[in-house]
Structure formats: structure tokens, C-alpha cells
Amino acid sequence: MKVLQMFFCVILLCVTSVLVEAKSTTKGDETASKRNFAQFAAMTYHTTHRWPKKYVGYGCYCGLGGYGIPVDPIDECCKTHDACYKKVEDSGICSYSWAIYLTIYKRKGGAECSEDNEKCQMEVCKCDSVAAKCLGKYKDIFNEKYAGYDKKGKCDPSFTLS
């Protein structure tokens, strides 16, 4: 049942974020995925035991785009994740700017990155791992009032991520 729930969740996340065809293959205890987003969803589910879709649109930073002041520590985790991706993108270690969203990296299961990753893969995996662990740390303070949050109306756009 959990496998079916996770598969359904990954499909919903991919549709929500306009990323299509989230397929996974498993080799030993390392997982490679066709889309980085599906891997982050798997890490998040592992650390929070919550459907990752619940975090899409949470607060001012969780999901696509983010600005303003984080509403709580969970939203701060998402802001940090956005900043981590931006740092990797700005560093130029990945071959093109959208690589951070499409990079296939290897995990040791859970929210741990495999040592058998190229530099771009490893940095993207680290961003996802740190964020998933952060979300797991604060899983008990998840507040439904911040799910589906009105970013345009409630997040202060003068505090954009730069």
C-alpha cells in the first residue's frame, strides 16, 4: 500500500510542477531517477512520512518560486533549499541552468547521497538531502493553514531571494 501511495504522490508532484514521466530504476540500494524532483519527493517522504504533495504551495517558499518572509521553520527549509539550488546553478558546475531540476543522482536509500555521483549530481543531491532532513526535523509542526498559501497576497515581495 505504501509503495502505491508513494507512486501516486510522485505522479501528482510531477504533474503539479509540470515535470512529466517520473520513472525510477533501482540497482542494489542506490536509486536513479529520470527526474530530480521525484528523487526529492522520495527523500521527503522518507523523512516526514507525509505525502510530499502536501508541501507544494506550503508557505512562501515551498513549491515553485518563493519570496517574502518564511511563515515557519518548514517554510525556512524550503527557502534554504531554493538558495542551495541557486548556489549550485550560479557555480556553473552543472552543464546548463536547468540541470539542477533534471539531474539524475544516486542515493543510498532514504535521504543519503551515494559517493558514486559526479560533482553536479552530488551538489544537487546534497541540497535535496539537507532540505528533506530539515522538513523531517519539523514534520510535527506542519500547519494546514500554510498549505496552499496565497503567496501573492500574503508574502512580502520586497524580500525576494537574491
UniProtKB/Swiss-Prot annotation:
Location in the cell: Secreted; Nematocyst
Q: Fetch the InterPro entries from UniProt.
A: PLipase_A2, PLipase_A2_dom, PLipase_A2_dom_sf, PLipase_A2_His_AS
Task: Relay the cofactor remark from the entry.
Answer: Binds 1 Ca(2+) ion.
Its function, per the record, reads: PLA2 catalyzes the calcium-dependent hydrolysis of the 2-acyl groups in 3-sn-phosphoglycerides.
| Family annotation (PROSITE patterns) | PA2_HIS
Q: Which cofactor does it need?
A: Ca(2+)
Under what name is this protein listed?
Answer: Phospholipase A2
**Tissue expression profile of the protein:** Expressed both outside and in acontia, a specialised envenomation structure laden with batteries of venom-containing nematocysts found only in the superfamily Metridioidea.
Pro-peptide positions?
23-35
**Where Ca(2+) is bound, by residue?**
Y61, G63, G65, D82
Disulfide bond sites: C60-C155, C62-C78, C77-C134, C84-C127, C94-C120, C113-C125
Q: Which family does it belong to?
A: Belongs to the phospholipase A2 family. Group I subfamily. D49 sub-subfamily.
Originating organism: Calliactis polypus (Hermit crab anemone)
Q: Which SMART domains match?
A: PA2c
What UniProt keywords are attached to this protein's entry? Calcium, Cleavage on pair of basic residues, Disulfide bond, Hydrolase, Lipid degradation, Lipid metabolism, Metal-binding, Nematocyst, Secreted, Signal
Signal peptide (from-to): 1-22
Q: Which reaction does it catalyse?
A: a 1,2-diacyl-sn-glycero-3-phosphocholine + H2O = a 1-acyl-sn-glycero-3-phosphocholine + a fatty acid + H(+)
EC numbers: 3.1.1.4
Q: Where is the active site?
A: H81, D128
Looking at the record's lineage, which domain of life comes first? Eukaryota
